[in-house]
Amino acid sequence: MVEQIKDKLGRPIRDLRLSVTDRCNFRCDYCMPKEVFGDDFVFLPKNELLTFDEMARIAKVYAELGVKKIRITGGEPLMRRDLDVLIAKLNQIDGIEDIGLTTNGLLLKKHGQKLYDAGLRRINVSLDAIDDTLFQSINNRNIKATTILEQIDYATSIGLNVKVNVVIQKGINDDQIIPMLEYFKDKHIEIRFIEFMDVGNDNGWDFSKVVTKDEMLTMIEQHFEIDPVEPKYFGEVAKYYRHKDNGVQFGLITSVSQSFCSTCTRARLSSDGKFYGCLFATVDGFNVKAFIRSGVTDEELKEQFKALWQIRDDRYSDERTAQTVANRQRKKINMNYIGG
């Protein structure tokens, strides 16, 4: 039987973000800048990661508390060996209605079919430019946008439902909004543009680098005829629009200009096995990995997850100002540990 629990702000729990690795094969400046994550950077050893059995156990207990959706993140999740084994385990859990995965797309041809066969049906591909030269400068690994576009074509050809995520930074890739909308509109693929956020500690974020939803919308309306779309469910983070001529939808994620803390239903598990109630968390998360490995029962695990959710009062984006960002003393958890 599913228990209905809410946090201190009355928010239910519906989603679980599972980071399966802290490693990535890109070095995007806003997430894992090469100056910080160089060739000598020490990533987590395997024994510091949750095993797939541990993740499945955690997901099963969370399903009993109301979680219906699971998203697999990283780092780059396709760098975790035998990820299809985890997908198959998660697909067997009663109550889990949707399993998604966020990826940079580079390894889709290598692993996509195995993941599909294990039950994965939905992926988000992070792609911040459609121009090859610009994309190479963003990922710092000399990977062309055309390479990722080919991987996306492959993913759709095997039956995966693909959405594309684009983090927009002023003066960096805001000139990519129109060409990317045009390209994916013709492909009938949903694209979502995300306001640049101050996740982690190393991306040099400030308000001047943010292109807001309203600024994006003004740009888009000069080139396309669009209509707004009603939200599909409670807690949907994107504001959706529809192209009038072919009905293809796109989204704008207002993580800075119009925060959505009040409807956030996500629990997050970092790659080193810690619980976080917010993408912008500063306090060290509860060590779920150590708790599980101490020999607790599923009932004890459930009670701990309930307690963690019921004391949750995070609303970082609601409270974000230039002053709060400048005065912040404690470091946030880095994005490669907690996913997006």
UniProtKB/Swiss-Prot annotation:
Catalytic reaction list: GTP + AH2 + S-adenosyl-L-methionine = (8S)-3',8-cyclo-7,8-dihydroguanosine 5'-triphosphate + 5'-deoxyadenosine + L-methionine + A + H(+)
NCBIfam families from the UniProt entry: moaA
GO molecular function: 4 iron, 4 sulfur cluster binding; cyclic pyranopterin monophosphate synthase activity; GTP 3',8'-cyclase activity; GTP binding; metal ion binding; S-adenosyl-L-methionine binding
Protein name: GTP 3',8-cyclase
Organism this protein belongs to: Staphylococcus aureus (strain NCTC 8325 / PS 47)
Outcome of mutating residue 31 to A: Loss of activity
SMART domains: Elp3 (SM00729)
Domain Radical SAM core: 8-227
Effect of residue 260 to A: Alters stability of FeS cluster and alters protein stability
GO BP terms, alphabetized: Mo-molybdopterin cofactor biosynthetic process
Effect of residue 17 to A: Loss of activity
Binding site for GTP: 17, 71, 102, 163, 266-268
Enzyme Commission code(s) on record: 4.1.99.22
Cofactor dependency: [4Fe-4S] cluster
Domain notes: The central core of the structure is composed of a partial TIM-barrel fold deviating from the canonical TIM-barrel topology.
Effect of residue 268 to A: Loss of activity
Chain's gene name: moaA
Function: Catalyzes the cyclization of GTP to (8S)-3',8-cyclo-7,8-dihydroguanosine 5'-triphosphate.
Annotated consequence of substituting residue 339 to A/S/V: Loss of activity
InterPro entries: Aldolase_TIM (IPR013785), Elp3/MiaA/NifB-like_rSAM (IPR006638), MoaA (IPR013483), MoaA_NifB_PqqE_Fe-S-bd_CS (IPR000385), MoaA_twitch (IPR010505), MoCo_biosynth_MoaA/MoaC (IPR050105), rSAM (IPR007197)
Cofactor note: Binds 2 [4Fe-4S] clusters. Binds 1 [4Fe-4S] cluster coordinated with 3 cysteines and an exchangeable S-adenosyl-L-methionine and 1 [4Fe-4S] cluster coordinated with 3 cysteines and the GTP-derived substrate.
Pathway participation: Cofactor biosynthesis; molybdopterin biosynthesis
Taxonomic lineage: Bacteria, Bacillati, Bacillota, Bacilli, Bacillales
Entries under CDD domains matching the protein: Radical_SAM, Twitch_MoaA
Annotated S-adenosyl-L-methionine binding sites: 30, 75, 126, 197
Effect annotated for changing residue 28 to A: Loss of activity
HAMAP family noted in UniProt: MoaA_B (MF_01225_B)
